[in-house]
Amino acid sequence: MDEITVDVRNLSKQYGNFKAVDNISFAVKKGEIFGLLGPNGAGKTTTIKLLTTLSPPTSGNASVAGYDIIKQQKEVKRNIGWVSAEIILDDDLNAWENLGLQAALQGITNWEENADNLLKYFELTEFKYKNVGKFSTGMRKKLEIAMALLNSPEVIFMDEPTIGLDVGTRKMLWDLILLIKNEYKVTVFLTTHYMEEADQLCDRIAIISHGKIIALGSPTELKQKAGGYAVSLEVNNGFDISSLKNFHILEKNKNKILIEISSKDNMLDVLRSINLENLKSINLITPSLDSVFLKLTGSTIKETEESVDYRKFYSMVRRNMQ
């Protein structure tokens, strides 16, 4: 039986009449990369704040590393690391001083050896005494992750860690996240609104929308729920469209035809039905997490984000926190 590191039970967070997190439940297995995927404003950051004891829940409960987030907050904090969406380093200090400040804030004693090992592992040793204000974005992210690992946590929470990064730096960070899992044996709880990121990194994903968990499973399991395999054909002018009468044509645009099929094996049925002499190309389109979200919510993540009035939402949150 899998050991559970994060156990969430009917957790809710309400600001006035607005439910930022609405009765969510899930469990994170020890040693996995668990992704909370959803658009901006879906409740991802609020969930992390609840699990890291930065904000109390309105109702429900959870345990992290075996400790109750309400009754055992100090124990929870001692056993977690946290990487925020924004880099939070002191630019006036060097890398070593930032690590020392982190140790002081967390009450970590005898931290120097672990800090040296982390700097070596993340290839930052030669920059140990360099002012971090002169670090590249990638180096700054590396240092922030090293700081999150300084207390040897059981779980590291990463809230939108690659937002705003260029493609190269984002890929570098993906490699670091996999390293954390494989080399440091740390459970990773990751929030993101990037479909590709969740697909590439996560062992399992919970999709959150409007504060509710609407799906949970591995990337493969979620994509299987969406179905939606398709075949894209590019044909010559003499192509006989009637040869596809037994298939559901999703779209026809000049010499390009998109056909829905129930499984990738049905691609052979399409090939058997048509005159191959009039076929220029054929491609199988597999389900994606984008199609999963679209099927579950009726909109894409981008469309969901655009529908949220953030100024109204944050104004309401501030009023209810006063």
Language model: regions and residue ranges:
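ABC transporter nucleotide-binding domains
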Residues: E3-V6, K13-S209, A215
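Short, charged/small-residue-rich alpha-helical element at the C-terminal edge
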Residues: G228-E303
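Short, basic, helix/turn surface patches
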Residues: R140, D240, I285, S307-M316
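ABC transporter nucleotide-binding domain
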Residues: D175-S262
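Residues that scaffold the ATP/ADP-binding catalytic core of kinase and kinase-like folds
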Residues: Q72, A148, K225, V292, ...
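ABC-family P-loop ATPase nucleotide-binding domain
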Residues: M1-S12, S299-Q322
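Generic alpha-helical secondary-structure signal
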Residues: N79, L101, N114, K225, ...
